[in-house]
């Protein structure tokens, strides 16, 4: 939610559930208005699709043929409630049918199929054919937070999904396609673990920030009125 990179046009998530959905359509509107061939990928979870803003956005996105791909990461439980308990039907992708929007499911546990499905939707948008609504059926192994006791599922269920873990599938695909060897993958794995550990060590050894930096990188304008009353 809090990962953001303006340089890479990655605009993060939103503190309000589903709040990013109309913003994503707005970005797509801006790109179309300026004649850009950019396509917006707007991600959301299975919990966010119960927000009314989704339907308002799908309607306008289809009406204006906006270059946006809506991608639902359906892990089956949102924060901790099964999708069967929140919807009359569990095929979330069918929500697109009500707006005559191209839509469909993709295997969210298979990165290759995800890439293929999204690439097809991007090409459709760039041709001027408007938005696509995709549901990536996936899974998460851990609770929504540290306080999540996960009473809503069994350990056997989690273990079954671990057998088709996306990272394992990518690794097998790389080896089968001879893009890399076991040794090269092992080296990459070690390098990544070392870099992550370095970041963790740096964070844990760093002092707490001063109160004076509380508002840094919050507002674009350095003279924003609210800043005159900051602590």
Placement of each model-derived feature along the sequence:
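Cofactor-binding active-site loop characterized by glycine-rich and histidine/acidic residues
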Residues: 1-64, 82-88, 93, 98-100
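Acidic, glycine-rich active-site loops and adjacent beta-strand->loop/helix elements
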Residues: 7, 44-50, 72-78, 109-112, ...
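Conserved thiamine diphosphate
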Residues: 32-36, 88-120, 163-189
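Structural motif
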Residues: 39-44, 69-71, 133-135
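Glycine-rich, charged/polar anion/phosphate-binding loops
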Residues: 54-57, 116-123
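A short, conserved beta-to-alpha structural element at the edge of catalytic cores
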Residues: 64-84
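Short beta-alpha connecting loops at secondary-structure transitions
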Residues: 76-81, 101-106, 151-159, 184-185
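Glycine/aspartate-rich loop-and-adjacent alpha/beta segment that forms the canonical ThDP
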Residues: 124-231
